[in-house]
Amino acid sequence: MKYTVDTHTHTVASTHAYSTIHDYLPIARARGIKLFATTDHGPDMADAPHFWHFVNLHVLPRVVDGVGILRGIEANIKNIDGEIDFPVRYESRLDMIMAGFHEPVFPPCDQATHTQAMINAIRSGRVDMISHPGNPAFPIDIQAVVKAAAQYRVALELNNSSFSHSRPGSENNCGAIVEAARDLGAYLTFGSDSHVAFSLGNFEHCHRLVTEAHFPEDRILARSPRALLDFLESRGRAHIPEFADL
């Protein structure tokens, strides 16, 4: 199956990344990516952009040469209460919010704390998807998290970079998440987690896992712009008419 949506990319606004949004566009066109989200790190990361960066994303065109650009953030889950590092009052400026654990903001501790923090973020209503939940540095009760994600209609990310260089040891956890999501009715999203444009739309490992698990295609948000946009609208995000023809 051809996947045409990438929900996790970073730009030079996160200074450990190396591409601009403009850099992503020709690669998106060449690879058949119809829609991608720009999701720079939330402000509590040391090298993240100021929250004004996210507030000002409205200056971006919706569609450039047939490629749609979603305005997003990879926020940080800050504590066991599931709070994230983006002001509620500006949330409407974004099309989607992804959130996850990052060591500089939430130091790894124990499975029970990680699990409760992630479930509380899911329950908060603010988070549309959870980034790299299979990170072995943050062990979780997979069944409990996936059950909450299914109940609250929050997508779980398969992060392709976790299998190659970012989070070694993720594969078994991600496989278990896919199987639990299949059985419990949760949605999956695919993220390249590109920190340079050359990896946009690389879902090699994501595709392999969902194929091996016989995961239902209709719960994979990367399959089409409409699949992702319908999911976000079902969560109360605004309809974006400019994306009608993607």
Swiss-Prot record:
Top-level taxonomic group: Bacteria
Originating species: Aeromonas salmonicida (strain A449)
Cofactor: record remark: Binds 3 Zn(2+) ions per subunit.
A molecular-function term among this protein's GO annotations: zinc ion binding
Amino acids binding Zn(2+) 1: 8, 10, 74, 193
Enzyme Commission code(s) on record: 3.1.3.-
Lineage start: Bacteria, Pseudomonadati, Pseudomonadota, Gammaproteobacteria, Aeromonadales
Cofactor(s) demanded: Zn(2+)
UniProt record, GO biological process: bacterial-type flagellum-dependent swarming motility
HAMAP family, A to Z: YcdX_phosphat
Name of the protein in question: Probable phosphatase ASA_1316
Gene3D superfamilies to which the protein is assigned, alphabetical: Metal-dependent hydrolases
